[in-house]
Amino acid sequence: MKGARVVALCDKNQEQFTAPTAGGNISGADTATDYGDAAIYDDFDAMLAEAKPDVISLTLPTPLHVPLTIKALQAGVSVLCEKPMALTAAECDKMLKAAHRAPNGAKLMVAHCLRFWPCYVYLKKLVDSKKYGNVVAASFRRFSAPPGWQKGTNWFADESKSGGVALDLHIHDTDMVNFLFGMPKAVTSTAAFDKNGAMQYISTLYDVGGPAVT
């Protein structure tokens, strides 16, 4: 990003900063990243107080989004928070209230990345311009193995912590429906579960008052 500078990084697991960055469901480098002169922390409060960042990118497990987002906003630091925003609507409301009250004009943005991918930006232009006419139907499909962001941990497999397939993965499609067609008038979902009760598949019909969207 032009004009931006990474001033600090923070992680309880300091090995994250010396190990190769490949992993998860997005390919990365096979060698350790050079973070230049960025300060390295293992304490979030210390980072806020000493590094005094203007903006932080919060890429932590979902249960940590609420407390650390609120803490940063209260310190006047803007937050780009990984999706999903939180596990419940009540928790989201807490984050929004903190953003409205934040000093220094600090802002909160949830990182729904697809809105900024070139192919989706182009799709949005086509829908809005009606270059090929009105959309009469739309279908989105998404397949993914569970990400392995942190080896040796299983928080993602615990739906009470991650939200599972519906909240962590399907949320991409829900966001794109809102982005392209606006807030649905009604939503109907069906799901399939494995023998342990974990959701493996979800299908949703969105009534947007126009095209049929699944």
What are these model-derived regions, one by one?
Residues 1-75, 93, 101:
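N-terminal glycine-/serine-/threonine-rich beta1-alpha1-beta2 phosphate-ribose binding loop
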Residues 79-80:
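A short hydrophobic/small-residue beta-strand
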Residues 197-202:
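A short, glycine/Asx- and small/polar-enriched loop/turn
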Residues 204-211:
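Active-site beta-strand termini and strand-to-loop segments that position acidic
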Residues 105-106, 114-190, 195:
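Predominantly a Rossmann-like dinucleotide-binding segment in NAD(P)-dependent oxidoreductases
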Residues 85-107:
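Rossmann-fold NAD(P)-binding glycine/threonine-rich loop
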Residues 62, 85-86, 141-145:
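Short glycine-enriched loops at secondary-structure junctions
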